Regions:
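Extracellular low-complexity, Gly/Ser/Thr-rich intrinsically disordered linkers
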Residues: 186-229
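Hydrophobic-face positions in mid-chain alpha helices that act as interaction patches
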Residues: 1-109, 116, 124-192, 196, ...
Length: 229
């Protein structure tokens, strides 16, 4: 078992021609938009990632939900338009590593196991570490997007906010996550894990597996807003 993100199983040899799969798909099709339900989860928690992970149609980073160009696609009701809705910054993360097994996933699994064993006191510091490491991984992908060779060749994205520091991530946990964890430990672990998997790291399959697993257990922790599903 690894003990830091430096030891995680990452495919990290992307460059200007060997492309991150999410970037490759979006760059060739321009067919993705940012999810309103995901933005709502960030807004509800005053999550600092909100000011880092969304881009408007003119390639400007969104500073938050009050930004005049903050326009998310309503899940299941969005219009089929290009260059209209905001997109996630991750679709521009040309060189961001694909994580086969990330350090934050390992920590989230440990926190979940402890909660299921009714050992939430032990789970809390593990969840805090998971959240901090997950935010650090978000920043890796943001940096990759801001420096993406193909994107920079077309002027590039306009970065409007500062990187999230470890101190800010820890404060976020203490002020926003911890109260929710105290009230419903397992639920908040799974929601934080779901948010952490929002990115360019290829972890959506794990998020889908978690969602199926929770449904089988009649655990409706993750609320999806697409009425067509």
């Amino acid at each position: 078992s690894f003990t830091s993100a430096d030891e995680q199983a990452a495919f990290s040899i992307y460059d200007a021609s060997n492309l991150n799969p999410l970037f490759d798909y979006q760059w060739s099709r321009d067919g993705l938009a940012a999810s309103k339900s995901m933005s709502e989860k960030l807004i509800e928690r005053n999550d600092p990632r909100l000011s880092r992970v969304f881009i408007d149609k003119d390639w400007n980073q969104m500073t938050g939900s009050a930004d005049p160009k903050f326009l998310m696609a309503v899940n299941g009701e969005n219009e089929e338009k290009q260059y209209f809705y905001n997109t996630s910054v991750f679709t521009y993360s040309q060189t961001a590593p694909t994580l086969f097994m990330s350090y934050h996933e390992l920590l989230f699994l440990k926190a979940e196991a402890l909660c299921r064993l009714n050992r939430s006191n032990e789970a809390e510091p593990v969840l805090k570490a998971a959240c901090v490491v997950a935010i650090e991984n978000t920043e890796v992908s943001v940096v990759a997007a801001m420096n993406a060779p193909s994107v920079v060749g077309y002027v590039g994205l306009s970065e409007k906010t500062a990187a999230i520091t470890t101190t800010t991530a820890e404060t976020y946990f203490e002020t926003s996550v911890k109260p929710l964890f105290t009230a419903t430990p397992l639920k908040e672990v799974m929601i934080q894990k779901y948010i952490a998997f929002f990115g360019a790291s290829g972890e959506s399959v794990e998020a889908y597996n978690d969602f199926r697993r929770m449904k089988a257990l009649n655990e409706n922790f993750i609320v999806l807003k697409n009425a067509l599903n």
